Amino acid sequence: PKVMGIETEYGITVRNQPDFNPILSSLLLINSYETYRSSRIRWDYEAESPLRDARGFEYAEDKDVPSKEESRLINLILSNGARFYVDHAHPEYSSPETTNPRDCVIWDKAGERILNLSRSRAEAVSPPEQRILIYKNNTDFKGNSQGNHENYLMDRKVPFARIVQYLMPFFASRQIFTG
């Protein structure tokens, strides 16, 4: 069976907050859910590095890469196997891996409920006139699109040129057979 999952980027804004900051609002959202849950599952980055590029090299140290403590504050691994986290300046939910489309939809809907519960809890600790708005599959005011995106699992030993050679024709033609 093929392993699949859905990774959804959500837009966020706060009504009646003149100094709105999407990063801080996303952090509040994520950590409101964490407060609801009693335990925290740690994310294991042992075999990965955010500085390792798919083309086979590593970047020099990046000041924008979060420390382990910062990473703990912006990442939640949920008991259902999903990941709920701040990705740049928006909340993101990555469903657990499944082996069929039905389960994929079930866990995507679970993500929507988690976002709504988090929003409700975050609003409870916010000033009463502020309302948190979460958007699924949208574009922000700068023209950045947010929605679903896909990931492909492959061995790091595969040369980047080979990835490009085989994936580019697929990316260019998939609209024909997937719509």
Sequence positions of predicted segments:
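Short coil/turn motifs at secondary-structure junctions
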Residues: 15, 155-157
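Histidine-centered divalent-metal-coordination microenvironment in nucleic-acid enzymes
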Residues: 138-155
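A short alpha->loop->secondary-structure connector
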Residues: 159-161
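Terminal catalytic/cofactor-binding subdomain
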Residues: 1-135, 144, 164-179
